[in-house]
Amino acid sequence: NKVVRFIGTLNGTPLKPTINGNAEAGKTSYMTCIACHGAEGEGNKALNAPKIAGLPDWYIARQLHSFKKGIRGSHQKDIYGMQMRPMAMTLANDEAIDNVASYISTFSAGVSSASTESVEAAPASTVAVNVSGSAEKGKTSYAVCVSCHGVNGAGNKVLNAPRISGQQEWYVARQLANFKVGIRGSHEEDVYGQQMRPMAMILANEQA
C-alpha cells in the first residue's frame, strides 16, 4: 500500500500516441465502454472499472487483444477480467481495436490525487480496494519500478511499460495483488505480465 500511495503522487506526462487509428470510428465502438469506464475514460470504482484516460494507445490496444484472446481475463479468480473479455470480443478485428485505442488516447489524462482513505485493502480481484500507507515510505519500494515505468510514472514504450501516474490507487493495488498471486501474468503468452510478476512479488505484504 505504501508503494501504491507513492504512485498516486506521480505526475508523469502521457506518452505520445503511436497508433494511427481512426478515432472517429473508435468513438462509435467506445459507446459500449461508457457505462463502466465513463464518457471521458475516468473510470468508476463502484463498478470496478479503472480509469483508462491517460493510458498510451499501444497499451490499450495490447490489453484489448489480450482480453480478446484470453491471455488476460481467463483466470478463474479474475472476476473483473472475465467481465472485460466479452467486451473486447465485440471488437471485430485489429483495425477496430486500433480505432478505439486511438479514440481513448484523445481523452484528457487528468490527475488522480492521493487517497486520504485508510480502509484495509481487500484480497486480490474481489472488491475495489482502498489503500492506506505512507507515500514517502513507498518511494523506497518504487525504486525497483523506475527502470521501466520511469521516475514520474510516465511509462516507456520501448520497454513496453505503460504510464501508471494518474491511475487510481485502488486499481493499482489490485493489479499488484493479482500479479503477485498469479491471477495476472501467469498465461504462457502474457510475456509482459510474466515480467511484472516477480516485480510484484518483491512487495512483502499489503503494507509494503
Language-model segments: which ranges?
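Axial heme c-ligation environment in periplasmic c-type cytochrome domains
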Residues: N1-V4, L15-G21, K45-K51, K68-F107, ...
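The canonical Cys-X-X-Cys-His
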Residues: V3, I7, G26, M31-E40, ...
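Sequence context surrounding c-type heme c attachment/ligation sites in exported
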Residues: K27-I34, G54-W58, R62, K68, ...
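Consensus positions within tandem repeat domains that build extended binding/scaffold surfaces
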Residues: E40, Q63-S66, Y103, Q175
